[in-house]
């Protein structure tokens, strides 16, 4: 190849890859949604059923005690009709800890690799590797942001010293490959890796694990993943991938909760898109998670079903049948028949702080529907006397609100402005991490 041809060939390769990613984006988001803009008035019919109305075998909820009595029924209904059961109980055990870099990121952080083993009551075990990044210039104990990575530790933390994963990952994940910058161009500069320096500078640690070690995002591999946990993948109540990821987050919390360098009440969940669904479910099930940063979670996350705006259940069940319970597909053509919806999921996290992120041109994720769900979930925070201040306009970000929504321009993805808002929100509620008063 002559030197003159190399730039041309490289350009053609990048254009070809970009076209491929554009096709992938169009498959995930219909073209008409790429030119639509979210309704910032968040208008729509009344959310039904109302959160505290009679139902689930109980009278109307009028007190905090009533609400606590209703919680188990709501969780059971969410598992049965949307997410599938949680995997059986297990405890995380540290097998080995390795110091990767004592002064990474220009001396800002210490990187460790932890090999974990999840031990079930029947003696069965599965392994999970994670990385912990500790800021060197912040006093401890530290709050920690938990992140599930689809590409592995090296890609998420931008250091080859963590090594390439053996488990399943998508083609755009290769560190230094051509696809990574294309993914960043289309889905945002932080879709594969968070702004590590900014997070460390704010005094937060990072805990990252490769999700595919326990739950690969592949329909063909999901049954095998469940079988490793001793589960029958053919039962109606088998865990969907979102449920499996949420369970893994709790197992990582088992391990982090034993590290005295970290705040006992300082576990913060972050997720984007499908992982944003999982962090909401994890926090709804496990009160150890003190805060949730959920970005563009869409259908099966914070957005309401049946709005007629975002991704319908029929589409998500056809494209990703392994994500949810088998029963969920039965609501594909009658979403309003679901006995539970996003406002129930959000309410189970009360009174802890939750940030919902959206984008103006990401109507497939239906940010207006997520905002309406947040307003419908407000009574749960009110019962805890934790709903003041409260964000009441979709286009006015109020980081001090316990359930807030941040909107930016653009499409589906993770941008620097998303992370600035998330860190501002975390800072606004940091005092809550210190006192740990978040009883649901």
Segments (PLM) and residue ranges:
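C-terminal catalytic histidine-bearing segment of alpha/beta-hydrolase fold enzymes
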Residues: 375-440
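Cap/lid segment of the alpha/beta-hydrolase catalytic domain
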Residues: 148-251, 255-258, 305-306
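N-terminal Sec-pathway targeting helices
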Residues: 1-20
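Short beta-strand element of the alpha/beta-hydrolase
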Residues: 131, 140-150
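Mobile cap/lid helix-loop segments that gate and shape the active-site cleft of serine hydrolases
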Residues: 291-345, 366, 370-391
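Primarily recognizes the serine-hydrolase "nucleophile elbow" in alpha/beta-hydrolase
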Residues: 251-311, 334
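Non-catalytic accessory segments flanking enzyme active sites
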Residues: 54-56, 60-136
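Conserved strand-to-loop "acid loop" that flanks and positions the catalytic carboxylate
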Residues: 350-365, 408-409
């Amino acid at each position: 190849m002559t030197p003159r041809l190399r730039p041309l060939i490289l350009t053609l390769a990048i254009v070809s890859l970009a076209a491929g990613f554009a096709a992938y984006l169009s498959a995930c988001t219909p073209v008409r949604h790429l030119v639509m803009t979210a309704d910032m008035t968040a208008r729509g019919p009344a959310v039904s059923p109302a959160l505290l109305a009679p139902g689930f075998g109980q009278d109307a909820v009028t007190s905090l005690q009533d609400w606590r009595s209703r919680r188990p029924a709501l969780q059971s209904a969410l598992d049965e009709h949307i997410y599938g059961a949680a995997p059986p109980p297990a405890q995380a055990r540290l097998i080995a800890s390795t110091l990767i870099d004592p002064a990474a990121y220009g001396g800002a952080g210490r990187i460790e690799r932890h090999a974990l083993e999840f031990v079930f009551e029947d003696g069965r075990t599965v392994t999970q590797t994670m990385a912990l990044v500790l800021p060197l210039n912040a006093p401890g104990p530290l709050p920690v942001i938990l992140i599930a990575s689809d590409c592995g530790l090296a890609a998420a933390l931008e250091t080859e010293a963590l090594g390439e994963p053996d488990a399943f990952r998508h083609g755009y994940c290769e560190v230094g490959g051509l696809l990574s910058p294309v993914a960043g161009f289309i889905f945002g500069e932080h879709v594969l890796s968070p702004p590590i320096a900014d997070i460390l500078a704010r005094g937060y640690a990072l805990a990252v694990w490769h999700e595919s070690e326990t739950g690969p995002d592949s329909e063909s591999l999901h049954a095998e993943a469940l079988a490793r946990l001793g589960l029958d993948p053919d039962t109606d109540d088998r865990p969907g991938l979102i449920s499996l990821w949420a369970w893994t987050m709790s197992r990582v919390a088992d391990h982090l909760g034993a590290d005295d360098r970290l705040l006992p009440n300082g576990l913060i969940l972050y997720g984007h898109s499908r992982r944003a669904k999982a962090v909401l479910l994890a926090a709804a099930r496990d009160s150890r998670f003190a805060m949730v940063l959920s970005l563009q979670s869409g259908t099966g996350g914070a957005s309401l079903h049946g709005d007629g705006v975002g991704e319908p259940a029929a589409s998500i069940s056809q494209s990703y049948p392994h994500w949810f319970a088998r029963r969920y597909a039965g609501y594909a053509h009658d979403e309003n028949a679901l006995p539970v919806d996003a406002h129930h999921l959000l309410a189970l996290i009360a009174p802890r702080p939750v940030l919902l992120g959206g984008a103006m041109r990401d109507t497939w994720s239906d940010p207006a529907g997520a905002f309406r769900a947040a307003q419908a979930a407000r009574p749960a925070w009110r019962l805890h006397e934790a709903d003041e201040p409260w964000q009441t306009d979709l286009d006015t970000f109020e980081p001090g609100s316990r359930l807030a929504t941040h909107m930016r321009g653009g499409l589906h993805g993770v941008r620097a402005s998303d992370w600035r808002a998330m860190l501002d929100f975390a800072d606004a509620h940091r005092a809550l991490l210190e006192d740990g008063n978040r009883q649901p």
